Amino acid sequence: MFHLGWFLGSGFGIQPWNPAGGDGVYTGANMRDWMKPDLYVDLAASLERACFDYILIEDTAMVEDSYNGSAEVSLRRGFMAPKNDPMPLVPLMTQRTKHIGIVPTVSTIQYHPYLAARLYTTLDHLTEGRVGMNVVTSVTDRVAQNFGYDQHFDHDERYKMAEEWVEVVKQLQHSWDVDAVIADDVNGIYADHTKVHPINFEGKYFRSRGPLNTIPGPQRDIPVVSAGGSVPGRELAARHGDTQMAMCKTVEDMKAYREDIHRRMLAHGRKPSDIKLLFLATPIVAPTDAEAQEKAEALRRYRYTDAAVEYNLWNMSYTSGGRIDFGSIDLDTPVDQIDLSKGNGERSSIANLFQDTEGKTLREVAAESFQITDLGLVGSPDTVAAKMEEIMDEVGGDGFLLYSPMTRHSIAEIADGLAPALKRRGAIRDGYTYTTLNENIHEF
């Protein structure tokens, strides 16, 4: 069996709302209601019925203005903004569910480790052990400037900072011994003070005395999720990750990625089974194979439209950390002439976008290259389920992190079409053995 997760790629932000902008005809009331909890609560209930492990909620705290030197496109089309803080949404998403995990993103420059440790421990209690933390370093200078920095740290230094951040959080999570809470109402003793300890951490980036003033939650150690595919990002996952989002375009890339992470884990004294790698994919599902192929062809044609090219150029600018304005580059420029080294953002994502693009122009890359691909998962539910099983058999595991436009129609295609087909094949779980996210991730 393999695992399934859902990537809520727009975070607690505006969801697909614009049929004229390529969002399709099933956008419903997203434009008016994206900031209300109902859509997300329904998502959690649907995906628990489908037996997903977790929902990963993207987040970033800025209004992007590097594309054409303006926030005009970002705000006109709703790219990355507006967006709400996902943390208050987490307990709401667990109210109609009992098992599925909710993994909000936390940035190591936005949250001090003490604040994060206290917040996630609180969420661990409120969700009864179903929260995880998606640890990111943030991408752009604009995020850093919103939190008091002149500009963002260089890429590799961000990950050194993140390593230290995770270490502080983990020490704080263990600042209460497992038997520190006595809860003796007869003798009037709540906790044993000798079993609650300062951590007195002093590092290059963070200092914290501790202890936490919250008691350990059901999981105690909140599962760590990460997404970085660069060498420092892989090292972070190998040292601390419980599950990782992996972005690959081919089965060969997936196998190589998994083998590399496992080698790094062994070097850090961890077992490869300690982490579950979920590969990003956008399956294209329809009632029949022919209809799915028609959807895929329509999507391919749309990618050459001005609206789609504008989005991809905008996304490239953002992904570079806001350091390269792809809107200012002539579309007929050969990509070999573009200096990508100036970027300071998602290094592996930029590499993914420009993989195998030698001899192409920026126009061609903007129309043909996307960070998340379908991995060949195009067809009826049974066809896609068989292909997913085939890929996992070849790669060796551990599962898929599915990304699809956030509409009730697309959710139903996965939860009520694809997932039942996978269950019939015995490819995914048909129920939950445990109640906490940590246990469900590591069950198999």
Predicted regions and their residues:
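An alpha-helical appendage that flanks or caps ligand/catalytic pockets
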Residues: M1-P19, G28, D156-Q219, E252-E259, ...
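N-terminal beta1-alpha1-beta2 module of alpha/beta enzyme domains
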Residues: M1-R96, Q219-I222, H442-F444
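Hydrophobic faces of well-ordered beta-strands that scaffold small-molecule active sites
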Residues: F2-W6, I55-I57, I100-V106, G129-V135, ...
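Conserved, mostly hydrophobic/aromatic
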Residues: L4, L47, C51, M93, ...
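Active-site mouth loops of central-metabolism enzymes
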Residues: W17-D38, T105-Y114, D150-H152, P218-V231, ...
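Acidic (Asp/Glu)-rich catalytic clusters
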Residues: E48-R49, P91-K98, D124-R130, L266-P272, ...
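Catalytic cores of nucleotide-enabled group-transfer and carboxylate-activating enzymes in metabolic
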Residues: M62-V63, P82-D85, L92-T105, P223-S226, ...
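Hydrophobic or amphipathic alpha-helical targeting/insertion segments
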Residues: R96-F147, F153, M161-W165
